[in-house]
Amino acid sequence: MSDENPLQPPWLNAPPVDPYPYEESHDLRTGPKLHPALDGLLPYVGVWRGRGRGGYPTIEDFDYGQEIRISHDGRPFLCYESRAWLLDEQSRPIRPAGREMGWWRPVLAGDRATGEWEALMTTPTGVMELHLGKRTGTQLEFATDAVVRTPTAKEVTAGHRLFGIVEGALLYAQEMAAVGHGLTPHLSARLIRVGG
């Protein structure tokens, strides 16, 4: 008869695990090779920083700074991370603002990208959005297919996002349907590459 306790988890006395062994990179000169299905979004990979303007019918307009990091680990998806902070009239930081994490995934036919994309985006405010979209040149356009909210999250029902690389800068515009309003312009920004 074995000395193992069937109620004891198998990992309880296992040796420690080494750090995560796979590299993720926002710099195409280092790290893993970009998956061929991501070639159409190669210009997006990097670290971007800049400023934007936001507003909505239920809030006052505001200026913000933002950093977006788009990275990969060699598999056919991009990791998207955004953090923003409010700016005063002299462009000084006031406080942290929106944060978002997500993944951009090409729709594949075999191993080849079709030009259609899926994006999964989550926020710490309890909203998760599933976007479907298309890439045209260096432009990427997404619209929500579904929005899931925690019971305490703000009522967000739809979104639309347009990203583009214009003269080396990352530009985007975001519309949102929330708290009883239809799709309405919410955010727009211009960011320059600061890494990658």
From Swiss-Prot:
PANTHER family xrefs: PEROXYNITRITE ISOMERASE THAP4, THAP4 PROTEIN
Taxonomic placement: Bacteria, Bacillati, Actinomycetota, Actinomycetes, Micromonosporales
Motif (GXWXGXG): 46-52
Stretch list, region Disordered: 1-29
CDD domains with a match to the protein in the record: lipocalin_heme-bd-THAP4-like
Binding-site residues, heme b: H186
Protein's name in the database: Peroxynitrite isomerase
Pathway linked to the protein: Nitrogen metabolism
Cofactors, names only: heme b
